Regions:
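Pan-zinc metallopeptidase signature
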Residues: 22-24, 183
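Juxtacatalytic substrate-recognition/specificity segment
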Residues: 13, 20, 30-149, 159-162, ...
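Flexible, glycine-rich surface segments
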Residues: 149-183
């Protein structure tokens, strides 16, 4: 793989992505997985292939395009994997099998150590968009404080598009934030 300081995945070649996919194929837990290159990520999922492709375009590509339009000039520093598991059972089993992780959230998480976004996609795409923010923050604002990194991700926990721009809508995190502010 190219070194981490190669200048972001926008500098990675087709050959880099092809080699990455070939490496991934060797570690797939079963033949039930579909792999889609959706630059700057590689999306891997155990839902039907059409569903994985739809998530890669309608959520991953859309979020990447809109977030870059608003905030980010550089892609993540490495080729990262987005693992989309079809349900809680698959998510928990495969997070353990692939990464030795026991998820602390039912939705998903970003692991910079494993260069992976790990999702229970049955809970929706909100957490996926939230987690996509983190590797972009790392690449574009390496000294960003954790509260801002999480805050920006949380803003996009429920997203849509207004006037061609990404828009974060009120989501389940607001009551907790309001309670913390009033303490």
């Amino acid at each position: 793989y190219p070194p981490a300081d190669a200048g972001g995945s926008d500098s990675f070649t087709e050959a880099d992505f092809t080699a990455h996919v070939e490496h991934l194929k060797k570690k797939l837990p079963s033949d039930d997985f579909t792999i889609v290159v959706q630059k700057p990520f590689v999306v891997i999922g155990d839902e039907p292939a059409d569903d994985v492709r739809e998530h890669s375009v309608r959520t991953v590509k859309w979020a990447v395009d809109k977030l870059k339009q608003e905030y980010f000039s550089k892609d993540p520093n490495e080729i990262l994997d987005i693992w989309l598991f079809k349900n809680a059972t698959s998510y928990e089993r495969n997070a353990q099998l692939l990464f030795g992780d026991k998820p602390t959230t039912p939705y998903g998480y970003y692991s910079s150590t494993h260069k992976a976004l790990v999702m229970n996609i049955s809970t929706g795409g909100g957490t996926l968009v939230h987690e996509i923010v983190h590797p972009f923050i790392e690449a574009n604002f390496p000294n960003c404080p954790p509260w801002l990194n999480e805050g920006l991700g949380s803003l996009y926990e429920q997203t849509g598009e207004l006037q061609g721009r990404i828009h974060g809508f009120t989501n389940w995190r607001l009551p907790g934030l309001q309670a913390a502010i009033t303490l």
